[in-house]
Amino acid sequence: MKHTDIRDCFEKEELVGSKLTVCGWVRTSRDSKNMAFLELNDGTTLKHLQIVIDKGSLTPDAEALKLGASLKVVGTLVNSRNNSVEVNAEEIVVLGKCPQDYPLQKKRHTLEFMRSMPHLRTRTNTFNAVLRVRSVMAEAIHDYFQSRGYVYVHTPLIT
């Protein structure tokens, strides 16, 4: 089964009630006796998709509940109480485990801290939002000049 972007789960009403597969990284997890809740993000949107795990029918691997783990979740997309959507998980596959010393946690990190880890910056909401704004601005600038007959030229680098 082909995976569905998390962005599409929020934007396409026709997906509600259907069985789908989503892949992403665990942003937060809450665990109780009978239920577990994960928030999954795949980078296609700033929103996080809540995954509901009924422990009576599905026992998640402990690795799946760790912040930063990469998962594939198969389940049914349903409307949630807060006018959003969530996935009732039927199957969870851990695609990538997260090391014990994973530096990103639930709390907000300073820009100084993130400067020391450029490979993880895009996993934060701040840098994700900055990249999206820059993308929209660059597209608008290119469209403006293209519509006026300008040609975009990649100049050679002089070293």
Predicted regions located by residue number:
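Class II aminoacyl-tRNA synthetase catalytic cores and aaRS-like
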Residues: M1-T159
